[in-house]
Curated annotation (Swiss-Prot):
PANTHER family: MULTIDRUG RESISTANCE PROTEIN MDTO, P-HYDROXYBENZOIC ACID EFFLUX PUMP SUBUNIT-RELATED
Pfam families: FUSC (PF04632)
Segments passing through the bilayer: 13-33, 38-58, 69-89, 93-113, 121-141, 152-172, 370-390, 407-427, 431-451, 459-479, 482-502
Native source species: Shigella sonnei (strain Ss046)
UniProt keyword annotations, A-Z: Cell inner membrane, Cell membrane, Membrane, Transmembrane, Transmembrane helix, Transport
Gene designation: aaeB
Protein name: p-hydroxybenzoic acid efflux pump subunit AaeB
Family designation: Belongs to the aromatic acid exporter ArAE (TC 2.A.85) family.
GO MF terms, alphabetically ordered: transmembrane transporter activity
GO CC annotations, alphabetized: plasma membrane
Record's subcellular location: Cell inner membrane
Function in brief: Forms an efflux pump with AaeA. Could function as a metabolic relief valve, allowing to eliminate certain compounds when they accumulate to high levels in the cell.
Length: 655
C-alpha cells in the first residue's frame, strides 16, 4: 500500500471526522459564538484522538468517554483558573507562575491515576493556563471567557458524539467473544507446556503472551462498558473472568516450578491426559469434562493441588464465557462466582516518575513565561499554551519525546496548510457557509485518513491547522497575526521538546525495584490468620504491576520470573492453613511492617537493613511454625519464599 493510498476501512472514520468538524462549525456560527474555532478544534480532537491511539476507527463508546473526560477536565481547569485569577489578580507574574505549578501538579496526578482517566487531569492543567493567559489584556472578562470556553467545548463534544452515532460505530462485542474462546485454548496449551516441563524460554514466552492478552481483554471490557448499558451483565462476568484467567496462569506456572524440585507430584495419569492436543474451545470443553471425571475417580487428595485449582478455575471460566456470549440473565451459580473477593488497589510504583513529569511540565511552562516576558513577542502566549499542551499530554505516554516530535512535525506541516486556507480558501468561501463547510470537511477527511495510519505529525497537524486558521466571529484577516500564531506554535513545541530532553527521566530502575518490593510485600502480607484479609483478591493488582514491569523492562526474564514467583507464593500462602493463635498473628503484623519499611526506604542502606531484618524475621517465623506444628502446606511455601528472598536480595535492595 502506497504512502498516499486510501484503504476502504479508513473511509468511514474519515467521513465521521469531517462530519464532526462541519457540525461544530455550523452550530458555532449559527449560535453566534465569538470563537467557533474552539468548538471545531474540540470536535476534531475528541474524534481523532481515540482513532490515533487505536490505529483505526475507534470502537463504540471510546469517543463518548473521551468527550466526557474532556468536559470534566475543562470544568476543573476553568474553576482552577477563576480561583487563581481572583486570588492573585493584583500580582500578574505570580499568577502565571502559580498556573505553571498548577499545570505541573495536574501532570503529576495524571501520572498516578489510571491511564484512561489521565486525559482529564492533563486537560485541567493547561485549560487554567489558557484562561489566565488569554484574559491578560482584559481581566474583568474572566467569568465570561470561562463560560464561553466551556460552552464551545461542550458543543464540540456533542457534535463529535453525534457524528459517531450517525455513522454506526463498531461494536467490540464480537472481538470480546472471539478472544474469550481463543484465550481458553491458549490457557490449556500453557498448562500442557508446564506439565511437559520443557524449555523454560518457551514457557516464559507463553505465559508472558497470556498476561498481555488478559490485560488486553480487560481493556476490551472497559470499551464494552462504555459502549452501552445493555452489556452490564457481560461486564460483570468479564470482570470475574479477568481474575479467573490470571488464576489459570498462576496455577500453570506453579505446576512448572513444582517440577523443578518434586517432579513426582505430577503423575503419569495427568501427563498422558495433557498430551492430547487441542485446537478449539470445543476441544477444551471435551477435555475438561474428561479431566473432571479423572479427578473424581482419583480423588482430590491424589490430585496435585495446582491441577485441581486449575480445573476449578477453567470450569468457572467456561460457565461465565457462555454467559458473556449470550448476555443472558445471571443465574444462581454465576452469581455465586461473581460474589467473589473484593479486589485490592495498590499504591502506584511510579511516584518518582510522576515527580519527574511534574518538574518537566512546571519548568517548561516557566521557561515559556520567561521567553514571553523577555522577548515581548505578541505570540509568546501562544507558545506558552503549546508548551503546556505538549508537556501535559506527552508525559503520561510511554515515549514523551516522540509525542513532542509528533507535535513539532504537526505544527511545521500546519504552517503551509494553514497558509493555503488563510490566504486562498477561507477568504473565497466566507460568503458561503456551504463552501466553508466543504473546505473544512476536505481537510478533516484527508487528515482523518492519516490519523488512522498513525502518521507522524498527523494529529498535531490537524489540531494546529484548525487552531491558526481564522474561524472567529466575525472573521478578520491579519497576516501578521496568522504568522505569529503559526510561529508561536512551532516555538512552543520546540521549547517543550528541549525541556523533555534536558530533564532526563531516570526513574525506570527505581520503579522496577519498587515493583519487585511490592511483590515481596504482597507475598509477606498473605501470611495472615485474619479472615477478611485472606478474602482480599490481590491477583488483578499483582498482574497489573507485572504488566507494568514487562513494559518497563522488555525482555528482562529474570525480573519477570522473580515477580511471577512472588505472585505464586502469595496465592499459595493465601490458601495455606496457618495455625490460628495470637503469637503468630502478632508476628504477621511485625513482618508486614518490616516489608512496608523496605518499600518506603529512601536510601540503599536503610533498604538493606530492613530487608536483612525481614530475612531474619522469616527465619524466626519458620521456627515458630515448627513449634506450633504447622502442616507442610504452610512450611514449604514459607521456606521457598525465604530462599527466593535470600537469592535475590541484591536485586531487591540495590538501586
Amino acid at each position: 500500500m502506497g504512502i498516499f493510498s486510501i484503504a476502504n476501512q479508513h473511509i468511514r472514520f474519515a467521513v465521521k471526522l469531517a462530519t464532526a468538524i462541519v457540525l461544530a462549525l455550523f452550530v458555532g456560527f449559527h449560535f453566534q459564538l465569538e470563537t467557533p474555532r474552539w468548538a471545531v478544534l474540540t470536535a476534531a480532537i475528541v474524534a481523532a484522538g481515540p482513532a490515533f491511539a487505536a490505529g483505526g476507527e475507534p470502537y463504540s463508546g471510546a469517543i463518548r468517554y473521551r468527550g466526557f473526560l474532556r468536559i470534566i477536565g475543562t470544568f476543573i481547569g476553568c474553576i482552577a483558573g477563576l480561583v487563581i485569577i481572583i486570588a492573585m489578580i493584583r500580582a500578574p507574574l505570580l499568577m502565571i507562575l502559580v498556573c505553571c505549578i498548577w499545570a505541573g501538579f495536574c501532570t503529576w496526578i495524571s501520572s498516578l491515576v489510571r491511564i484512561e482517566n489521565s486525559y482529564a487531569w492533563g486537560l485541567a492543567g493547561y485549560t487554567a493556563l489558557i484562561i489566565v493567559i488569554t484574559i491578560q489584556p482584559e481581566p474583568l472578562l474572566t467569568p465570561q471567557f470561562a463560560v464561553e470556553r466551556c460552552s464551545e467545548i461542550v458543543i464540540g463534544i456533542v457534535c463529535a458524539i453525534m457524528a459517531d452515532l450517525l455513522f454506526s460505530p463498531r461494536s467490540i462485542k464480537q472481538e470480546v467473544d472471539r478472544e474469550l474462546e481463543s484465550l481458553l485454548v491458549a490457557q490449556y496449551q500453557l498448562m500442557q507446556l508446564c506439565i511437559k516441563h520443557g524449555d523454560g524460554e518457551v514457557v516464559d514466552k507463553a505465559w508472558g503472551d497470556l498476561v498481555r492478552r488478559t490485560t488486553a481483554l480487560q481493556g476490551m471490557r472497559s470499551n464494552l462498558n462504555m459502549e452501552s448499558s445493555r452489556w452490564a451483565r457481560a461486564n460483570r462476568r468479564l470482570k470475574a473472568i479477568n481474575t479467573l484467567s490470571l488464576t489459570l496462569i498462576t496455577q500453570s506456572c506453579e505446576t512448572y516450578l513444582i517440577q523443578n524440585t518434586r517432579p513426582e507430584l505430577i503423575t503419569d495419569t495427568f501427563r498422558e491426559f495433557f498430551d492430547t492436543p487441542v485446537e478449539t474451545a470445543q476441544d477444551v470443553h471435551k477435555q475438561l469434562k474428561r479431566l473432571r471425571r479423572v479427578i473424581a475417580w482419583t480423588g482430590e487428595r491424589e490430585t496435585p493441588v495446582t491441577i485441581y485449582s486449575w480445573v476449578a478455575a477453567a470450569t468457572r471460566y467456561q460457565l461465565l464465557k457462555r454467559g458473556v456470549i449470550s448476555n443472558t440473565k445471571i443465574n444462581a451459580t454465576e452469581e455465586e462466582i461473581l460474589q467473589g473477593e473484593p479486589e485490592v488497589k495498590v499504591e502506584s510504583a511510579e511516584r518518582h516518575h510522576a515527580m519527574v513529569n511534574f518538574w518537566r511540565t512546571t519548568l517548561s511552562c516557566i521557561l515559556g513565561t520567561l521567553f514571553w516576558l523577555w522577548t515581548g513577542w505578541t505570540s509568546g502566549s501562544g507558545a506558552m499554551v503549546m508548551i503546556a499542551v505538549v508537556t501535559s499530554l506527552a508525559m503520561r505516554l510511554p515515549n514523551p519525546r516522540m509525542v513532542a516530535i509528533d507535535f513539532i512535525y504537526g505544527t511545521l506541516a500546519a504552517l503551509p496548510l494553514g497558509l493555503l486556507y488563510f490566504l486562498v480558501i477561507i477568504p473565497n468561501t466566507q460568503q458561503s457557509m456551504l463552501l466553508l463547510c466543504i473546505s473544512l470537511a476536505v481537510l478533516g477527511f484527508f487528515l482523518g485518513i492519516e490519523v488512522q495510519k498513525r502518521r507522524l505529525g498527523s494529529m498535531g497537524a490537524l489540531a494546529s491547522t484548525i487552531n491558526i486558521i481564522v474561524l472567529d466571529n466575525p472573521m478578520t484577516f491579519h497576516f501578521s497575526q496568522f504568522l505569529d500564531s503559526a510561529l508561536g506554535q512551532i516555538v512552543g513545541c520546540v521549547l517543550a521538546f528541549t525541556v523533555i530532553l534536558l530533564v532526563r527521566d531516570k526513574s525506570r530502575d527505581r520503579t522496577g525495584r519498587v515493583l519487585l518490593n511490592q511483590f515481596v510485600f504482597a507475598a509477606v502480607s498473605a501470611m495472615t490468620t485474619n479472615v477478611a484479609r485472606r478474602k482480599e483478591n490481590h491477583l488483578p493488582a499483582l498482574y497489573q504491576q507485572l504488566f507494568l514491569l514487562m513494559n518497563k523492562f522488555p525482555g528482562d526474564l529474570p525480573k519477570f520470573r522473580l515477580a511471577l514467583t512472588m505472585i505464586i507464593a502469595h496465592q499459595r500462602l493465601r490458601d495455606a492453613p496457618i495455625p490460628v493463635n495470637e503469637d503468630l498473628s502478632a508476628f504477621h503484623r511485625q513482618m508486614r511492617r518490616t516489608a512496608d519499611h523496605v518499600i518506603s526506604a529512601r536510601s540503599d542502606d536503610k533498604r538493606r537493613r530492613y530487608f536483612g531484618q525481614l530475612l531474619e524475621e522469616l527465619e524466626i517465623y519458620q521456627e515458630k511454625l515448627r513449634i506450633w506444628q504447622a502442616p507442610p502446606q504452610v512450611t514449604e511455601p514459607v521456606h521457598r519464599l525465604a530462599g527466593m528472598l535470600h537469592k535475590y536480595q541484591h536485586a531487591l535492595t540495590d538501586s
